[in-house]
């Protein structure tokens, strides 16, 4: 983003001053109003713990600023609803993480699904987790938890691919009640382990595994199974490593190497700045972010109440823009037929 924006002001704790200045901030403050209300600030980036997301975003939107917001949109549906309404009527754009649908690999997979390459989607799986943060205790306190921090990625990706959810059922637990944060032991007060089942509006079912309990894994980040095929993203949805496509009419798995290995999971900043510059709307909408939050809160509630929870919000399909370039043939590896000569008139397996 060098040359696109200037870092006018940064807000944080006193010990963060030197780092902010070193990274280019022209001034530093510990008072957030000195950023959200500053006349020379056009775009506010909120990177605080979730409990303060809504308050800070509302303050910035009230001042006519554009806002880039860490996930989730808020921890409260009422606050989130106010944010969506402000974004609809105000001059400022609102873009909320996760930004996984911006990746070229995600968008290519979405086009395969929309084009009917795997038939009607019937079921899906998603997974994201790790052993858990050791640098701050808010992850293990109310307003934190593995769903807000990790499950949000899977929910954003699955609903981005398959559309809105209509019902959620979850089992959540505290698997490891004591965590080491820096040099002290912290008691875990929110879920660190979750399994979520989502019934989508289309009738498809999706399962999400997430938690601060996954030491390592090698399975795909996302899997979508349709009536005539399947597609799965390799790596994590925030760091794709290509994808695999099965079509019954092809009779083989086609393996597509990652075509954008340098794509950053922070790409939302670039996207938002481009939208501001060009006068366009982001392809990730506040309505989608609100829906993701409703699913998250429904999963938390379901885990506590041990019953399914209906989801009432919706959103329009994500605008993926024009189709991306066709993958070069040398980037494609068909692991069941790689040594077979192509049939007469056949096209490359990587055509998108």
Describe the residue ranges of each PLM region.
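Hydrophobic residues in well-ordered beta-strands that form the structural core
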Residues: 29, 69, 94-96, 125, ...
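Predominantly a Rossmann-like dinucleotide-binding segment in NAD(P)-dependent oxidoreductases
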Residues: 93, 100-187, 306
